[in-house]
Amino acid sequence: NDIAYFAVPSTHVDKVQVMCGKSSFKVKNIMIMGGGKIGRLLAANLQDDYDVKLLEKNSEKAEQINDKLENTLVLTDDGLDIDFLESENISSLDCFIALTENEQINIMSSLLMKHYGVKQVIVHINSTSFFKVVRRIGVDAVISKNTSAVNEVLKIIRSDEDKLTVSRFDEIDIESVEITVDENSEYLRKELRISDLPSEICLAAIKRNNKII
């Protein structure tokens, strides 16, 4: 039940999937559950490149959303009606994204989608304490507004003239640090080896002239 994390160039993601025994696939059909601000913005950004369906349980709100999203099919449902979901052929979905404000419903619907064989399931939760649990039950990705907000604050208060970027990953209790090294950087004042790094630090990648070395 181990979870492995890889730092790779985006062009090599397919190779990692194959190495881990997971075949890559192209996303075409996407279903978003939740017509809140995040769901609407996401649908608006995806609808021109993908076949997008958006579920909103409030019929009046669904009608308003439908008027604004020309290339998104807006449906009225809470995401837990099995008969309705089967009528929408959910087993053919490439990606399901649960974005309601109710994290219990998000988790339940995500488990249901996994049961029906949806290739990629993404769930939004409010409490970061659920991160590890949700990942363990088979959800492919977990997002949280709280974590996103924390990351943005970290980037601001711990930045050094845009030379250092910090991001936090609460589900594994680590922080990633991206450092831009220039000719005046203190990091170049002495020769460093990977073996010189403290045991708590792992060097993931070095990028030079737009290439990973």
Regions found by a protein language model. Name each.
Residues 1-213:
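Cytosolic regulatory regions of ion transport systems
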